[in-house]
């Protein structure tokens, strides 16, 4: 099998303060057919400045994979249901092995 061919996919991450919030967001995205998959990992230790104060929080990261057609819809859905006042939203264009990339790109309804 030739694994040299690639397909473009989008990968985004956000973080939540609990595994329950991460599960809720992931399930909403999957059930809405907006993403092919979500992976939750954690706990992570996040350090940042928020409203002038240095903050140390335990968080869980959600990594989402989906097609470029759903880019705006995925971001809007996450920002709509996320419990944070200012959720992290980082989206990256990536290349995946062709068969996996095709699965990602064809899993979601448009």
Per-range role (PLM):
Residues 1-110:
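Positively charged, small/polar-rich N-terminal and surface patches that mediate targeting and assembly
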């Amino acid at each position: 099998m030739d694994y040299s061919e690639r397909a473009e996919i989008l990968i985004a991450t956000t973080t939540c303060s609990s595994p329950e919030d991460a599960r809720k967001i992931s399930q909403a995205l999957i059930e809405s057919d907006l993403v092919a998959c979500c992976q939750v990992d954690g706990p992570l230790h996040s350090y940042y400045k928020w409203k002038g104060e240095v903050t140390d929080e335990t968080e869980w990261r959600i990594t989402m994979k989906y097609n470029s057609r759903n880019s705006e819809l995925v971001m809007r859905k996450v920002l709509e249901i996320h419990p944070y006042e200012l959720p992290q939203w980082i989206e990256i264009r990536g290349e995946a092995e062709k068969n996996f990339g095709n699965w990602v790109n064809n899993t979601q309804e448009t």
